[in-house]
Curated annotation (Swiss-Prot):
Enzyme superclass (EC): oxidoreductase
Domain of life: Eukaryota
Disulfides per UniProt: none
Listed name of the protein: Superoxide dismutase [Mn], mitochondrial
UniProt function note: Destroys superoxide anion radicals which are normally produced within the cells and which are toxic to biological systems.
GO cellular component: mitochondrial matrix
Source organism of this protein record: Charybdis feriata (Crucifix crab)
Location in the cell: Mitochondrion matrix
Amino acid sequence: MLLARAFARRSLRAGLWCRQKHTLPDLPYDYGALEPTISAEIMQLHHSKHHQTYVNNLNVAEEKLAEAKEKGDVSTIISLAPALRFNGGGHINHSIFWQNLSADGGEPEGELLAAINRDFGSVENMKNQLSAQTVAVQGSGWGWLGYIAEGALQIATCPNQDPLEATTGLVPLFGIDVWEHAYYLQYKNVRRIMLKPSGISLIGRISLQGSMQQSKNATSCSGA
């Protein structure tokens, strides 16, 4: 029960419950835009099949949760917690992931660059640490660069589709998907290539200031 409530609060803060039905977000680029680093086939399957499945299953789980609440069915409410966490986390994680990638690449600057240099010594050090920790994930999961309320940056990994903020309290800035569907068709079992690709900056176009503002907007939306 507590897990279901905790996930609901996190989802609200992320702005995902500002609409009744979750939908698959459009990509800000074509499926082939990231080639040759990430193939169009992988992007199409990853987005339109895998992410769509998380969205569909999350909607089903939330419908069942609403019905269970109306009936006061505590047993069913508790039993839905794993599905909400897994599919809700998959939706949150992938929605962030697509925005982290850019055909044009880009390097951190301004407030984000200053924070990286402060907490890791350099962008290269941060990349190496993020790569090493993410490669070490056993099975499926994610590697993240996130920040805490005080503004310090941290690297963390999460298993399966566990969402970063609900699991660690860190606000996600940049995520790396190391589920096999994210790379296996193209790179087989060579995970490291996907973590430090030659054609796309590890940081993409993210900025600390922009991510903080998005978090504030999501909180305002959930309270409306």
